[in-house]
Design a protein with these regions (language model features):
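Short coil/turn connectors at secondary-structure junctions
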Residues: 34, 44-46, 87-88, 122-126
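Short glycine-aspartate micro-motif
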Residues: 36-40, 90-92, 126-130
Length: 130
């Protein structure tokens, strides 16, 4: 499970770094401490990873409603001191219920995340067999 979370962190960092390369550093943006959140809303489980000022991860059952699960994730993050509506937090969502994450800065398909994660882990171009 630890390897899974490491992969999610790599994918999240890679996506955000590419999207904001000219405007932000992954460590700080304009002198602020930043938090980066990767959310994978699957059909049965939702996985969340936080990296930056806070370093956390957790898993919740998705249940019948991805929208309700997103609210639970948002509330749990707030309990941990991570405000997803803050300019100091950037969020990437993927998975079956990714569209329900209305507070995400970026929404990416699972296939794209797998490809970017595989490339990051392999250190360059590679083949992925699913």
């Amino acid at each position: 499970m630890k390897k899974y979370y490491e992969n999610v962190i790599l994918i999240t960092r890679g996506i955000l770094e590419k999207q904001h390369r000219n405007r932000m550093s992954l460590k700080r943006e304009k002198g602020r401490n930043m938090n980066y959140v990767g959310i994978d809303i699957g059909s049965t489980a939702s996985k969340v990873v936080v990296e930056g000022d806070k370093k956390e991860h957790f898993v919740l059952p998705t249940g019948w409603s991805s929208k309700e699960t997103c609210e639970k994730i948002k509330n749990k993050l707030l309990e941990m001191g991570v405000d997803v509506t803050s300019d100091d937090t950037k969020v990437v969502a993927t998975g079956y219920g990714r569209i329900a994450v209305d507070f995400a800065d970026h929404v990416i398909t699972e296939i794209t995340c797998h490809a970017r994660g595989g490339r990051e882990l392999a250190g360059g171009d590679c083949s992925i067999i699913d």
